[in-house]
Structures are given as C-alpha cells and as structure tokens.
C-alpha cells in the first residue's frame, strides 16, 4: 500500500466487527466540526470496502453446517468485542458456555490464555475458506450477509462480467 494508506480488518483493528477488509487514507474517521465544514460534510477519510465472496457447497447439509458454524463464531466474536449479548452483559460463565459450543461444533480447541478474539477471527476466516473449497453449487455469496439470510447468493456468472459506471457526471 502507499505510505499514507492502511489496511483495516477484524484481525488488525480491535473495533472492526465486519467481515471485510478496508483500505483507508487514515486510521480513524475525523468528524471534527472545522474539518467537516471545510470538506462539505465529508469526513476527511476515504476508503474502499472489500467484501470477500465465497462459493456455496453443492450439498445443502454441508452448506447449513457451515452457516451454523459461521453464525455461532461471529456471534461469540461480537459478544467478546462488545462484552454483551442481546443488549445485556454476558457473564463469564455464559461466555465460557458459548466458547465451548464453538469448540464442540467446529471440532477445535480454543486456548483460554491467548486472545480469544484473534483465535475466533482466525477460525471464522478458516471456516469460510473451507466452505469455499467444497464442491461448488455454482452459487456465490457474501458470507457476512449470507450467514443471516440463506437466500443471499447469486449464480457465479453474475460476477464474471464488468459494467462500467462513470464516477460523477
């Protein structure tokens, strides 16, 4: 990346909870009154969001298994980040229960003496990668949206053509 650009994702930045990568010209959004006025309300940060796409497995049973795992890992990851679940604080026992569920469902061991957030983020990425390696149904999805809505997928052909869209005027 150029010198004054940063790549931000949930591995590198603690408060990023979206399953995406972000290339930005600043590490933080600047929303001070003077700068907003100077730049016509535009925070002096610009960037590009990069959403990864994965193919869905041909076997519906395998597809549902990955969706359940990805959903559970993501929920626990968010709970760790915000230290709350369903608008209420999670106790250590509740968190431990959910981490044990992830371990059981995914067949992994999570070290309690290391960063839970980093381990879960890695596991989340690994599960989406593994899902994409299954025999493909020919359908592609944005995993972040698909995890909540199983109907969010499109034929692979949709992503194989480019459409030029002019930028401003």
Map each language-model feature to its residues:
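Short, His- and charge-rich active-site/binding loops that engage polyanionic ligands
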Residues: 67-72
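Conserved catalytic core of two-metal-ion nucleotidyltransferases
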Residues: 2-58, 77-168
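A short secondary-structure junction signal
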Residues: 60-65
């Amino acid at each position: 990346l150029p010198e004054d650009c940063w790549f931000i994702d949930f591995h590198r930045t603690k408060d990023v909870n979206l399953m995406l990568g972000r290339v930005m010209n600043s590490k933080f959004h600047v929303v001070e009154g003077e700068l907003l006025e100077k730049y016509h309300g535009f925070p002096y940060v610009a960037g590009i969001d990069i959403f990864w796409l994965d193919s869905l497995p041909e076997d519906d049973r395998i597809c549902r298994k990955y969706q359940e795992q990805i959903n559970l890992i993501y929920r626990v990851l968010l709970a760790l980040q915000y230290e709350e679940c369903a608008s209420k604080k999670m106790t250590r026992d509740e968190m431990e229960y959910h981490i044990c569920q992830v371990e059981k469902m995914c067949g992994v061991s999570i070290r309690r003496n290391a960063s839970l957030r980093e381990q879960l983020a890695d596991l989340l990425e690994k599960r989406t990668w593994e899902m994409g390696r299954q025999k493909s149904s020919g359908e592609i999805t944005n995993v972040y949206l698909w995890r909540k809505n199983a109907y969010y997928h499109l034929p692979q052909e949709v992503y194989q053509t480019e459409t030029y869209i002019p930028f401003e005027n």
